[in-house]
Structures are given as structure tokens and as C-alpha cells.
């Protein structure tokens, strides 16, 4: 059976949860996803929990089914190789790497106008934020935990990373469809904080808390 994204190649320059989950989701839909890591591995390559062999179960779970490329991201030659993987491939990149001007939409669009660039952020203004800090900032710890506990309790599920990764995968699918129809690329930014606030609004949890 032909998978929905069987003819699509996606380059993923990422680490941790949201962006790798986006790539994993696209891979499970049939896309060829190339996970790019720096030499020695990204900061999540040995993240707990570890198997007896020392391999990160976490990393393996989020990157199964992908191709892997280890490239020197600091060298001009390595940066050019990654750009070529993107622009000479299907022109789709997903990243949560910040501050890499050579990997920006603007830079890639100079050689491929219809590039689809998806950037995952902590916060919409570009400042840092991870799942548990965003969760605390949005007020969700006030509505999680035991009913008899008055104080805020953070949950253990990286919910906003997961939601953000799935939203990002949907954004790629939508952008590819639009490009197929119009030839237009896309610059897409998705922030964990925005995802959390949008989800809170949709579920009405924080409003319910006010009424309580």
C-alpha cells in the first residue's frame, strides 16, 4: 500500500521531543526523513532512560524509521551540505535549532524559492522555553494533581512538546499540499507557549478554574 507521503523527503535538524516527533510522524506517513545530528550527537542522544547497552531508549523511540546523517554543523562545508540536502531534495526542513542564520528560511529561499521551513520555538518572541517551564507559565499545574492538593503540581507528560510536534507535522502536510497547488513555499513558526495557550483556550480549563 502506498503511504500518503511516500514521495516526500524531509530534512530534520533537531533535538529533544517536539521536532523529532514531527519528523517521526511524517516518517510514519511514508516520508523519507533525514535526521541531521552534529558530530558526537545532539544534546539528546544519550538522554535517559538508557538500555543496558547505553543506547538512549528515548532517542531511539523518537528517531526510528528515519535516515541518519552526522555532519559538522560548525564548518562551512557541513552547512553547505545540509543546505544542499534541503534545496536539492524536496525543499522541506523541520528544525528547533535557534540562531543558525545559514539554515533560515531567508537563506534557503535564495536558492529555492518554494522551500518549506518549519521552525519550532519555546516562545513566540524567540526566547527560550521548554515543556515544563511553558506548562508552569500557562497555569496548568493549578488544575492537575490530586483533588485534595491546593498547590500547583506539574504533570510528567511532555504534553506541549507532543502537541507541538503533531501540529508541526500537520503544518508540513498542509504546506506541501498548498505548494503542490500553487508553487508557493512557506515560512512556519510554531511555539510551545502558543500551542499550550491555544489548547488551554480550546479546552476551557483555565476559564473553568476562574469560575471555581
Describe the role of every protein-language-model region.
Residues 176-209:
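Substrate-binding/catalytic subdomain of NAD(P)-dependent oxidoreductase enzymes
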Residues 1-181, 210:
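N-terminal helix-loop segment corresponding to the beta1-alpha1 unit
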Amino acid at each position: 500500500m502506498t503511504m500518503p507521503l511516500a514521495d516526500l523527503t524531509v530534512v530534520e535538524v533537531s533535538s529533544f521531543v517536539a521536532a523529532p516527533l514531527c519528523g517521526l510522524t511524517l516518517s510514519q506517513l511514508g516520508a523519507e526523513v533525514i535526521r541531521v545530528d552534529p558530530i558526537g550527537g545532539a544534546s539528546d542522544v544519550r538522554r535517559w532512560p538508557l538500555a543496558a547497552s547505553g543506547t538512549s531508549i528515548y532517542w531511539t523511540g523518537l528517531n526510528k524509521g528515519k535516515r541518519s546523517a552526522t555532519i559538522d554543523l560548525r564548518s562551512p562545508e557541513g552547512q553547505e551540505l545540509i543546505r544542499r540536502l534541503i534545496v536539492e531534495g524536496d525543499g522541506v526542513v523541520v528544525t528547533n535549532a535557534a540562531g543558525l542564520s545559514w539554515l533560515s528560511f531567508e537563506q534557503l529561499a535564495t536558492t529555492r524559492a518554494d522551500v518549506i521551513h518549519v521552525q519550532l520555538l519555546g516562545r513566540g518572541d524567540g526566547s527560550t522555553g521548554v515543556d515544563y517551564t511553558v506548562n508552569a507559565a500557562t497555569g496548568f499545574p493549578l488544575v492537575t494533581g490530586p483533588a485534595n492538593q491546593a498547590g500547583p503540581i506539574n504533570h510528567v507528560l511532555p504534553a506541549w512538546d507532543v502537541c507541538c510536534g503533531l501540529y508541526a507535522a500537520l503544518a508540513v502536510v498542509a504546506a506541501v499540499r498548498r505548494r503542490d497547488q500553487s508553487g508557493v513555499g512557506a515560512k512556519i513558526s510554531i511555539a510551545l507557549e502558543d500551542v499550550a495557550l491555544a489548547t488551554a483556550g480550546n479546552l476551557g480549563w483555565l476559564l473553568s478554574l476562574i469560575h471555581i
